[in-house]
Amino acid sequence: MAIYFIGLGLYDEKDITLKGLETARKCDLVFAEFYTSLLAGTTLDKIEELIGKPIRRLSREEVELQFERIVLSEAKGKDVAFLTAGDPMVATTHSDLRIRAKEMGIESYVIHAPSIYSAIAITGLQVYKFGKSATVAYPEKNWFPTSHYDVIRENKERGLHTMLFLDIKADQNRYMTANEAMEILLQVEEMKGEGVFTPDTLVVVLARAGSLNPTLKAGYVRDMLNEDFGRQPHVMVVPGRLHIVEAEYLVTFAGAPRKILDEV
């Protein structure tokens, strides 16, 4: 008996691979979590209808603190599927879950699916030029994270692009927009004053990756702050040093100002 970590892809229930679908249908029990990412184009009911089985949705607490009791205990005697948005091994949490399964002597298998790490190529930015990614988190009382700012600075110094994931608080139904992320980064800029993220910084926003009509826009922060990017999820990129083809792509497909062509 085993646990199968199955990716659901980026947007709706049709993004799961045939291998993932066939495996989920064969499993005795199916669990899922949606707090690490969002499938904006579908619902749990639609996924259940496609798979033909009931799915137990787990909370963050159940995944991180009770996974052994709820899921792995079942995998000792049954085949269990664990569904996640995107690719299952992109989230560090899921890597930890697989380690726990190994420690309990339970076989585990990974079935990949489309991920933002591949879909980000629709921006026209060359994938091999991306540096370390970071998450822009919602500030809280007595806690204002700034590590994402430092990551942008470090990548810029090396000419690399920075992909920024935007905070998700699924239990509160809060999904950060690119506009909110820009506001937060401008606040950090005021605090640090290093010129890393200013109104003149070029940013690229991708919304609803994986859908038939994703939104792709590029421009300077001062012009993008009030843009309507539509429904979440959003992801944002702060480009490093652009190649001429990257710049032309952003102008052609993301509406970037032609001025960037003179800056490469």
From Swiss-Prot:
It catalyses: 2-[(3S)-amino-3-carboxypropyl]-L-histidyl-[translation elongation factor 2] + 3 S-adenosyl-L-methionine = diphthine-[translation elongation factor 2] + 3 S-adenosyl-L-homocysteine + 3 H(+). The keyword Cell membrane does not apply. Its EC number is 2.1.1.98. One of its GO terms (biological process) is methylation. GO terms for molecular function: diphthine synthase activity. The keyword Transferase applies. Keywords: Methyltransferase, S-adenosyl-L-methionine, Transferase. NCBIfam families: dph5. Pathway: Protein modification; peptidyl-diphthamide biosynthesis. It comes from Thermococcus onnurineus (strain NA1). The lineage of its organism: Archaea, Methanobacteriati, Methanobacteriota, Thermococci, Thermococcales. This is Diphthine synthase. S-adenosyl-L-methionine-dependent methyltransferase that catalyzes the trimethylation of the amino group of the modified target histidine residue in translation elongation factor 2 (EF-2), to form an intermediate called diphthine. The three successive methylation reactions represent the second step of diphthamide biosynthesis. Homodimer.
